[in-house]
Amino acid sequence: MRILGIDPGLRTTGFGVIEKHGNKLAYVASGTIKSDGNSTLPERLKTLYDGISEVSRTYAPDCAAIEKVFVNVNPQSTLLLGQARGAAICGLVGYGLPVFEYTALQLKVAVVGYGRANKAQVQEMVTRLLMLPGQPGSDAADALGVAICHANGSDTLGTLSGLAPDLVRKGMRVRRGRLVG
């Protein structure tokens, strides 16, 4: 399975492509899509949309994973990030890809094993997990991390969805991301 990970941003959007074969992950490509800060917002969003579309055509992924927006201290920044994320999702869906969403916390737990990991720790673990010769930039590393998060979680999600009816009958439910009974 080939997975395209996206770390959305209005100035710089990171992308990372990995392949999953059984339990093994293999690096395919990564990079960034940059928009001109002097352009209008609609032009910047189109640059992002076109870039995501081109990456999708070039690497032909089976699915995409994108980081969810977090609410920032500055509401204007959150709104702009949400618009950039929307443009990225439109580019992915326009290519016909199923899109999966993950929080920064899920990404950090999947890659580093610790939800409060910093960017340097994510970069280091992405480099190790994919056996890269050098560290990718922080945006590309986050995108690769989202792809790794999906690769690691897709088997678990499939298994859990098959078990869901049995667990419900036994009185089990998910609370705060944990299975409780």
From Swiss-Prot:
The active site is at residues 7, 67, 139. GO terms for molecular function: crossover junction DNA endonuclease activity; DNA binding; magnesium ion binding. Its cofactor is Mg(2+). Belongs to the RuvC family. The RuvA-RuvB-RuvC complex processes Holliday junction (HJ) DNA during genetic recombination and DNA repair. Endonuclease that resolves HJ intermediates. Cleaves cruciform DNA by making single-stranded nicks across the HJ at symmetrical positions within the homologous arms, yielding a 5'-phosphate and a 3'-hydroxyl group; requires a central core of homology in the junction. The consensus cleavage sequence is 5'-(A/T)TT(C/G)-3'. Cleavage occurs on the 3'-side of the TT dinucleotide at the point of strand exchange. NCBIfam families: ruvC (TIGR00228). This is Crossover junction endodeoxyribonuclease RuvC. The gene is ruvC.
